Amino acid sequence: MITGLSIHNQINKKNEPVKKEQNIQAFVRVRPFSVYELNQGVTTVPIRVSDSSKEVLCEYKGTTRQYKFDHVFDQDSIQSEVFNIAVKPICDEVLLGFNGTIFVYGQTGTGKTHTMEGKHGSNEDMGIIPRTINYLFQCLEQSGADYNIRASHLEIYKEEIFDLLACNGNENLNKPLGMFDTQKGFKIPELEEIVVNDRQSILNVLAKSCKRRQTAETQYNKQSSRSHCIFSITVHVKETSVGGEDLIKIGKLNLVDLAGSENAEKSGNNDRLREAALINKSLLTLGKVITDLTNNEKHIPYRSSQLTKILQDSLGGKTKTSIIATVSPSLVNLEETINTLEYALKAKNIKNTPQINQRMSKNSLLKEQSSEIAHLKQLLQAAYDKNGVYLTIDVYEQMKRELEEKCSQQSITEHKMEAQRHEISSMRKSFDEQTMLFEEAMNELESSKKQQQEKQKFIDQFISQDTMLRSNLGSAVQDLSKLHEKLDTMKSTERENQKSIIDSKSILSKRLTDLNQMLVSKLQMGQNELLESLSVQLKVVHDQQTKSNQLIGKRINNLSQLIDSSVLQIQQLNNDDKQQTQPLLKLNKESNDLFMKLDKTIQQLSDQIKIILSDFSLPFFNSNNNNSNNGDEIIDDSLINNCFKLINDHVNKSDLIVSQQNKLIQEFSESMSQWMLHQSQYIIEQRDYQKQLKEKQILNNTQWEKKLLSKLGQVIQQFSKNFTDSTSVYYDTMDNNLQHFEKQFNSINNHSRQQVESLSNNLQQSSTLSHQFESTVKSVLNDHHANNKKVDPKLIESIEKAKKRINQLTDGCIDLSQRQRQCTNQFNEAFTDFTFGIQSQKDILDRVIIEKNQVHEILPLIEKSKSTFKENIDTLIHSLDSRKSIIQSSTNECSNQLNSLISSIPSYLDSAIKVTSKSGETPSKKHFDIPSPISTSSSSSSSSSISSIHSNAGGKENNHQSINNSIKSNNFDGSKSINCDNMKIDTPQKSSTIPITPKSLKLNLNSTPKSVSKNLKSSQQQQPLIVPSSNQLTLSAKKLSNKEYQRLQQQQQQQQQEQQQQQSAKKKKLAIEKQLMITTSPTLSLVNESPFSSPKLSKQKILQDQIQPPQPPSILSQLNSTPISFLQPQQPQQQPPSFFNNLNGSFNRGNNSIDFSLLDDDSDSDNSDDDVRSLLSSNKKSSRASKNAVVSKKVGLTPSRKLKGVNSSANQSLNVKKSKPILTSLSKKQNISTPIIHSSKPSIFGGGSTISSKLKSLKQQTPLK
């Protein structure tokens, strides 16, 4: 039977693609500079984006790092560009049925939330989430398929999960959600998932949920998100299969806004610091997961953080993932930027295997949902039946099984814990035992170290004492011999010095006097030259100043001429003004006369009219009282009255106009006269002032020329002050006068214009009034003529007469008005001429102003010349004073020094000559005879004696001791070897012993007796030599007090007691040492001093020993008394120290010298065993043929210690170095190889063992340090 499930599985198998691994896509976005960074002027960008937009170049600590990503968004990138390149492909994959995840990671304040959310409400600044929602809805709507979109929004704050889409109740708002591990992964059952139908509703839900997110203000950002935020979108799309069955395609997209990684120092205090710690913890676990995935680790710590639990499938799972890293361009955040880039680069290397989600049929979904509903109903029914929480049987049995499994696991773990406890207890016991043993070993080691340190200190003391004694002895002998030679030379040199000093006194005095005279003459010459040069300079300055004064004088003369010409022009203008004002005055008089005549005619006319009227009215009124009407009388009266009023008004107005014109003309004439007077006075004053200035200038010039040579600086200052004052006063007065003149000119011009305008207005008014009067008179006459046609003929005649008279008067008035017009025209012409004259005066004033400006231009030139002159003179005076003071001081110093030198030379020479006073205490030369050592040729003797010379101040006591006595008296151990050529003694310290094979012993002998030459010949035949010592040793002694003598004796007694104690300790070890001792008959004898060999010391001997402090007896006697033999060291920790470890000195016996040198440790040590074997074999052969043999001692090498040799003279040197074993030989100015004869008795080493095998065993037992 074909079911929907089988069809669904077949479709999924067909559509299931081949599993391919894909890397996580990594993008980088660089934010632009913030407002705060721009205000601070930050411009340097350590990050650069390549042209291909796939690489980031970062300059860090002098190197350029390069990071490659899938795409890099620069500072100018916009939100739509980021969405189209980074997010849109994953959205398309989600619609096809894949799961996708997009991370946004970066430092706090780099724009993660802006990239993910953007600004709500603006189309340009929308983030990834709203653009994704719009794009999904757009694609689904265009496809026309049935779809369902669900959204959830959660945040992880302080490792707790909170639902941002929960209801607004207080209980659920702050309640953290739980996460459970299931077979399908980690799930959050209480997380609310909202079904969304349109884009606007989901955007509104998103805006509300974003507001609930945890934010705070930090040093990076004012509103920084303090939690991880995950916005999940689940898309269900319905499809129909070929068989007509409905299938559902599911895709899920997680948009993750991670909290910002930040430095703890920049996070702030208290809460912000704790939040940053938790944020960094979760990001650290995410980084561990990323690194483990890139390294292909077996275990990946997904469970370490809530974030990695939720996003487990996105990292190395079946989803398509991309990460967007946001970085800052600021140089301050460079380290965080580099960490972010490396973080993203690691994430890019993670490989996912994206798989498409299985398409589910409608029936299967319904079955799953129905089973879940039934399960939930069972739980509800169980809960409703009884109080409390009840479960179904299936759930109870399942829980019971889980409990049993957990109990069994717990028992197993308890058994394991018990076993581990037993193991831990046993381990503790063993550990305690080992610690006890370790402590005991450490204590023993510390005690042994202390003993070793004490012994090493003791050895170092002896070595230092020995080196000091040897070096001081050699140097003292040399110094004493050289002192006497120096004394002899000093006496001769003193005599010569006295002679040379006496000669040098006279020569020096002569030369110094000559030098003094030469210096004085040179100084005088220099002074004269300086004075001449200064005089020349002063002349040059004087010439320059005279030239500048002449130029200034010329300019001033030109200005004075210009001023004179301007004054003449002003006078001419005054005369012209007077001439022009005279016709104006005449016009004024004529106008006054005309107005007077006019007044008279008007008065006459009025009188005549009155007479006529009186004559006319009396008969008229008397004869016709009855016949006349009231209306006619009223008309006549009114006519007459109007006529009189008009005449009176005209007369009054004409009088006013005339009076006003008279006043204006008088005022104008007065003002012009005053102005002319003022101008004339001003011109006179300017002339006088100019004359005074000229006189002052002449006086100043004469005074300046007279006093220039005597007091140059003072005269210049006074002249400059006077000149500046006079010029400033002159120019100030000129400025004031010109300003006053301009003001007066402007006021006169304005006043004259006003007067002319008023005159013209008055004339117009008078002309209009005359015309009005004529017209009124004519109208009145016409009216009278019309009204009085019926009057008597007498009246008519009188009226006609009156008419004639009136006509005459009117004609006269008309004539007067015409004349008045002529006068006004003449006045206007005169005024225009006057105005032209004033304009010409204005031109003259402009010229005067130009001259004033020229004068102002001259002033800075004068000041410049004055300042330069002042500077030149000041510099000259300063240079004169300085040079004068320098010359005087130098001459005084030179003369004083020369005089002091001349006076101090004889006293200095007298004091410098030191005459050596004879004290009588200088020691004289003393010769000490050093006898040659006793040589023994018998082979049966165990050791040859070495004679030691003990010399005192008198040279009376000479004590000789043999080698055997010196061996008995010295505390010498068998663990030391003496190399006679190089005087090398090695003290083993916990190390294996290697025999010393002498290579070279060089003796430079100036005088060798016959026995020595014989021995040298025999030494060439491989025979041992005896060192001769027949010359003398020179010593010097000092006197000692009794107290010092007693103290030295006490010290010597103490040393003898210590020596006895050491000898008693050594007797216990003699049995062991005798078994290893190899004795042969021949020995090498050396001659040396042993001052502590004899028990009795004389006072002179103690005086001799005061040269060096007393030392233990093992210092020199060990060299003389130690037998040269092979000794096996027993118990090296208890061996006494040797003073030969750091040997540095020389032995001198007259002209004979012994050179001691050791080879360096840098030579090859690998062939030491072979060298020893070859030398031993050669020594066995040579011992059979030789009569005298040198027996060496087998010792162990101590750690390398290098010392520089001290060469006291050419023939006396002792160079000591730590080295490999060497061969010893004696020669006179050449190297002679002397073999060493070893005893080949097997009984000494026990069991017939050879020397080489014993040496090997010793090497294996105690290796070299």
From Swiss-Prot:
GO cellular component: cytoplasm; mitotic spindle; nucleus; spindle microtubule
Record localization: Cytoplasm, Cytoskeleton
Residue stretches of biased makeup (Acidic residues): 1158-1169
Location of the region described as Disordered in the Swiss-Prot/TrEMBL record: 918-1026, 1085-1119, 1127-1146, 1158-1214, 1245-1265
Domain Kinesin motor: 23-350
Main location class: cytoplasm
InterPro entries found in the cross-reference section: KIF11-like, KIF11-like_kin_motor_dom, Kinesin_motor_CS, Kinesin_motor_dom, Kinesin_motor_dom_sf, P-loop_NTPase
Polar residues composition bias: residue spans: 960-980, 1003-1026, 1085-1097, 1250-1265
GO MF annotation: an example: microtubule binding
Taxonomy, superkingdom: Eukaryota
One Pfam family this sequence matches: Kinesin
Biased composition (Low complexity): 930-951, 1100-1119, 1128-1146, 1174-1195
Keywords: ATP-binding, Cell cycle, Cell division, Coiled coil, Cytoplasm, Cytoskeleton, Microtubule, Mitosis, Motor protein, Nucleotide-binding, Transport
Residues the entry annotates as binding ATP: 106-113
Coiled-coil intervals: 331-459
Any Gene Ontology biological process: cell division
Role summary: Microtubule-associated force-producing protein that plays a role in organelle transport. Its motor activity is directed toward the microtubule's plus end. Cooperates with dynein to control the spindle elongation rate, but is dispensable for mitosis.
Family: Belongs to the TRAFAC class myosin-kinesin ATPase superfamily. Kinesin family. BimC subfamily.
Protein name: Kinesin-related protein 13
Organism: Dictyostelium discoideum (Social amoeba)
Gene behind this protein: kif13
